[in-house]
């Protein structure tokens, strides 16, 4: 069965795979962030959002995986085998959890649309040959300020004419008004 945990959120495993593995913070840091920002909502018996539910599930699954890792560490006598299991969990499963936690925390923090726009813009940036792309990758926290997305069906905003300067005002008065408008 091919299950994509991001499908219902408009994303995909492939879209997140454009971000390099070292982009994602550690699971511990992500869990601490989720707890610091959303503890009340995550511990609430109320349903808050699908992102909260996904974070709850990921947190519970990570806890169970750590219990299994502890059991393996205690019960697997061969150090080489133990290292292989620990390495597999950290590299493969750890990355999947880091991606999952990052995605849902980011959606709650910045909004799902912003995160999806970021993933698409990063994917375009990373696939563009270095000679033709800007030197710096897009940054999620600045995306809402710099991204212009035109939705279908919306007419462009009308431009309002600039205010006309009244000739009867003295230059001193005009300067003070321009200072006010800069603030």
From Swiss-Prot:
One of its GO terms (cellular component) is T=4 icosahedral viral capsid. This is Capsid protein. One of its GO terms (biological process) is viral penetration into host nucleus. The keyword Translocase does not apply. The keyword Repeat applies. Residues 177-183 are annotated as: RNA binding. GO terms for molecular function: DNA binding; RNA binding; structural molecule activity. Self assembles to form an icosahedral capsid. Most capsids appear to be large particles with an icosahedral symmetry of T=4 and consist of 240 copies of capsid protein, though a fraction forms smaller T=3 particles consisting of 180 capsid proteins. Entering capsids are transported along microtubules to the nucleus. Phosphorylation of the capsid is thought to induce exposure of nuclear localization signal in the C-terminal portion of the capsid protein that allows binding to the nuclear pore complex via the importin (karyopherin-) alpha and beta. Gene3D superfamilies: Viral capsid, core domain supefamily, Hepatitis B virus. A motif (Bipartite nuclear localization signal) lies at residues 158-175.
């Amino acid at each position: 069965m091919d299950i994509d945990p991001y499908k219902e959120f408009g994303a995909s495993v492939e879209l997140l795979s454009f971000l390099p593995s070292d982009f994602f913070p550690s699971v511990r840091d992500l869990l601490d962030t989720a707890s610091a920002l959303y503890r009340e909502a995550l511990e609430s018996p109320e349903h808050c959002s699908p992102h909260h539910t996904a974070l709850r599930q990921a947190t519970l699954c990570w806890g169970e995986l750590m219990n299994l890792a502890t059991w393996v560490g205690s019960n697997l006598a061969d150090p080489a085998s133990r290292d292989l299991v620990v390495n597999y969990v950290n590299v493969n499963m750890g990355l999947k959890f880091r991606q999952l936690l990052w995605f849902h925390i980011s959606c709650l923090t910045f909004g799902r649309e912003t995160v999806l726009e970021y993933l698409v813009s990063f994917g375009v940036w990373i696939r563009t040959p270095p000679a033709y792309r800007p030197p710096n990758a897009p940054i999620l926290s600045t995306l809402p300020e710099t991204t212009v997305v035109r939705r279908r069906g919306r007419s462009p905003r009308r431009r309002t004419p600039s205010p006309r300067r009244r000739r009867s005002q003295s230059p001193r008065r005009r300067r003070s008004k321009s200072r006010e408008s800069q603030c």
